[in-house]
């Protein structure tokens, strides 16, 4: 099972007055829930995106016309919704039939670092392939390129905002 036997991860070093330094350790538990798909934007997905994209990153506008046509995925840890993303057929690349866009991947801060984003991305890729899709594309900020590259995505030459944003693609077949 994912995460079984995962070593503890150091999360901080604290200097205690009059005492030796002590390491604080925590084990990052794997997600213990499920991923569900919706044909509309659920309120819990909206709330996660508001927190991650609007409050933390100040993206505006966050919600757009693609929310109405996308498949929305929610990841649950137990009964709590902790992550979301959406995907839809890419209408802007008719030269690449079977290309889908995976977008708005967001994991709540207290659930990050547990592989939930990776699981959600893999689930979206499986669903796209099952629907006949052959290419997954993500539009990302450059500080997240490595996340996608570690999962098989390649940066394209479609860069924006002086390279701060770009498209990454992955063949699904």
Which residues does each PLM region occupy?
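Short amphipathic alpha-helix that is part of the acyltransferase structural core
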Residues: 23-80
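Conserved beta-strand in the GNAT
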Residues: 74, 80-90, 99-106
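A conserved beta-turn-beta hairpin within the catalytic core of GNAT-like acetyltransferases
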Residues: 90-102, 112, 162-165
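Conserved acetyl-CoA-binding loop-helix of GNAT-fold acetyltransferases
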Residues: 113-126
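Conserved GNAT acetyl-CoA-binding A-motif
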Residues: 128-141
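C-terminal "cap" of GNAT-fold acetyltransferases
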Residues: 141-142, 161-173
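Conserved acetyl-CoA-binding loop of GNAT-fold acetyltransferases
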Residues: 149-159
């Amino acid at each position: 099972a994912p995460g079984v036997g995962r070593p503890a991860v150091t999360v901080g070093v604290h200097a205690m007055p009059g005492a030796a330094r002590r390491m604080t350790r925590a084990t990052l538990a794997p997600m213990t829930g499920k991923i569900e798909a919706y044909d509309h934007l659920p309120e819990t997905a909206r709330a996660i995106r508001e927190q991650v994209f609007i409050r933390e990153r100040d993206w505006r506008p966050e919600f757009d016309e693609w929310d109405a046509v996308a498949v929305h995925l929610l990841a649950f840890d137990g009964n709590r919704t902790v992550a979301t993303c959406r995907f839809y057929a890419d209408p802007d690349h008719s030269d690449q039939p079977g290309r889908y866009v995976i977008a708005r991947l967001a994991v709540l801060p207290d659930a990050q670092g547990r592989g939930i984003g990776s699981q959600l991305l893999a689930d979206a890729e499986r669903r796209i392939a099952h629907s006949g899709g052959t290419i997954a594309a993500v539009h990302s900020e450059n500080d997240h390129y490595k996340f996608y590259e570690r999962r098989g995505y390649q940066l394209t030459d479609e860069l924006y905002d002086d390279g701060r944003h770009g498209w990454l693609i992955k063949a699904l077949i």
